Regions:
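Residues located in well-ordered beta-strands
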Residues: 26-28, 97, 127
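Glycine-rich, aromatic-bearing surface loops/beta-hairpins
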Residues: 125-126, 130-144
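Active-site glycine-rich loop that binds ribose-phosphate moieties when present
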Residues: 121
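Exposed beta-sheet edge/beta-hairpin loop segments within beta-rich domains
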Residues: 16, 114-118, 126-130
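Central antiparallel beta-sheet cores of small beta-barrel/beta-sandwich binding domains
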Residues: 30-115
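Amphipathic, well-ordered alpha-helical segments in soluble domains
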Residues: 23-29, 103-105, 134
Length: 144
């Protein structure tokens, strides 16, 4: 996947991404934070439960980091139009609007991230690609 989220010719992937459907139920993920030099700074596992509500979906996340830190977050995701979604959570520092294009779901936002014992305002550029009905690859670029 290119930095802008384009699939580099992978247009054959036809799994339409609907966040309100994909995030419903129980989810698991693993990931890591890598600095701009390619050094892994932090690893995590994430478990989440998505609960369908009248206004969209509520996603209850728990992050377990390799340094023993645990972080809980609740996202509220609601549809704004056919291909636009809005996300809300307590640590947002800006609007969070996402767009779906086929199997791609992308959104960007400013966020207060807990890092090394303090809260740091960062910018997330998030791109998710739905590969199969139950598999998504997520690339989140985090910058200050």
């Amino acid at each position: 996947m290119a930095p802008d989220g384009i699939l580099n010719g992978q247009s054959h992937i036809s799994n339409e991404f609907d966040p309100s459907v994909f995030f419903a139920g129980n989810l698991r993920a693993t990931g890591m934070f890598i600095d701009r030099f390619g050094v892994v700074k932090r690893r995590f596992t994430m478990s989440a439960t998505g609960i369908t509500e009248a206004s969209g979906i509520s996603l209850h996340e728990t992050f377990n980091y390799d340094d023993g830190d645990v972080e809980d977050r609740i996202w509220h995701i609601s549809r704004r139009s056919d291909n636009r979604f809005e996300g809300r959570t307590d640590d947002l520092a800006s609007d969070c609007i996402g767009t779906v294009r086929g199997p791609l779901f992308s959104w960007s936002y400013h966020f207060y991230l807990k890092m090394f014992g303090r809260r740091v305002k960062v910018h997330f550029d998030d791109v998710m690609v739905r590969l199969t009905p139950d598999t998504v690859i997520n690339r989140a670029r985090v910058t200050k």
